[in-house]
Amino acid sequence: MKKDYKKLELDKILDLLSQNAYCDVCRERIKKIKPSFDIDTVRTEIAKTDDAFTLSSKFGTPKFYNIKDICFGAKRAQQGSSLSLRELMDIGMFLREVSGLDDWYSQCSGIQTSLTEYFEQLSVNKHLENMITNAIISEEELADSASPQLAAIRRSIQRKSLAVRERLDKLIKSQSTQKYLQESLVTMRDGRFVVPVKTEYKSEISGLVHDTSATGATLFIEPMAVVEANNEIRVLQIEEQKEIERIIKEMSELVGSFAEPMINDYEIVLTLEIYFAKANLGAKMKAVTPVI
């Protein structure tokens, strides 16, 4: 049978079809499609592809994205695990696609097709979609708007950090101090503000040594005048991390509570994308619906 597939160049057709899909998972599924020899199945598949073509011709092709497989993350969240920001971002992108497909299909109201059941099964979740989209900047950072508490903590860190910098700026600009410094700058070591002091003058700047240069010529000292303020900043940074973990946990729990409908939607989205990919390829090839 595989030899017959090769003679028919099925692999080349499937490769062309995969190029009309948007997500990697969908492309891989397309390449694994096998012909059916059941006439009812064949007729059903042709009808769905034909309906996708008709809808695309009237309303344009719905927008698909390169969504990632969200099933594993959704199941982990369902079991109580906190997800990574990357996993949450992928889920947010997926939920946006579900919303987009639902919006697109709303313009087709009143038109019944063999694809109607797929669209009507989609579970739009704007609350979770907006929560994730508004809270996450990147896979490494939450937005200040993720929670009022996070925003307040970060404002406090910013204010206290600015005060420490201003105090150290005065120190490094003082003529009596400059001769002890390797450079007139404020830098960071171990998350604390320090100044670069020449090793031979370490006793002239009272403070805590956090690091040395590769050559040993410079000590990075945290002046005693800012130790307490740096401690306060560190406490705030710990509070910030705890709040970040709380927010991620809250979003993960919400994802877990909707895991089953999301996994169902994921399969529906991939199925729809394949039918519209077939319709797009058919349009490009100026293909005609076969009569069986």
Which ranges hold each PLM region?
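Long, charged all-alpha helical bundle/coiled-coil segments in cytosolic proteins
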Residues: 3-7, 51-122, 127
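Alpha-helical coupling/stalk and coiled-coil linker elements that connect catalytic or binding modules
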Residues: 1-61, 77-82, 113-114, 129-292
